[in-house]
Amino acid sequence: MKRAFIKLIFFAAMMLPTGAMAQVADSLINVCYKDLEGEDTTAFNLTYPLLYDAYVKENDEMYPVIQMLKKVHDRDQSIRILLSDIYKNMDAKGKYLSIVRQIMKNIDQENVKIVTGIIDEYGWLGKDDIGEEANETLFLCIQHCQDSLLQHKYLPIIKEAVSNGNAEAWHFAFLTDRVRMNGGQPQIYGTQTINVDGKTYLVPLQNPNNVDSLRRGVGLEPLNDYMQGFGESFSVEEYLKAESVIKQRFEQWLHSHGK
């Protein structure tokens, strides 16, 4: 059931016959009436705001899915916040790097099982179905998993979801580049970076001259802006000068990751 539609049917439901609404919402309504009858404004103000959430829980079939994806999202992002802090403080926190990376790998494996189960049952649910955060979580878990075959399997599914308005074009761009990177191919949209010997490198680009145009087409910022987030910069001229080194570092990275 569409989330926007829930807001409309909630008010219509107030006019339904007794018993048409589920038990918890019904109970809350009865409490509201009792509070009004007893002129207990304080109690009423505490109770009536609970009605909408109770109604949604009982009538939106996607509610359990949304709640599950919220937990998945928080696990996915929280462990990465911790990992990012370690990278920023390697001298003091570097000893935790290997264990946190292993924990993250385990989390990603667990999360992708949940997410692929949801996608296989419901299809790629859009924002109107489950909200923006849950929708993005579907993409994040496919993107972050270490299973290249699984990512390749879901690439055409997310492409179709983009065409149906159920996923963002940049989701497809990121996953496309990830699949190509893992296959040892140059990336298209410039979304993937690697770290070799403590330095961040772009994965080699298929078409550096047109990369910003391609990024613009999927709603991504210019590549130089993106790379500044890693403490690096990008220009076509700089890239072409360093291209042979970039390719060497990529080969080194592929070898170290058994690809």
Task: Describe these PLM feature segments.
Residues 116-182, 186-192:
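Mature extracellular/secreted ectodomains of secretory-pathway proteins
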Residues 28, 111-114, 154, 207-214:
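Stable alpha-helical elements in mature extracytoplasmic
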Residues 1-28:
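Bacterial Sec-dependent N-terminal signal peptides
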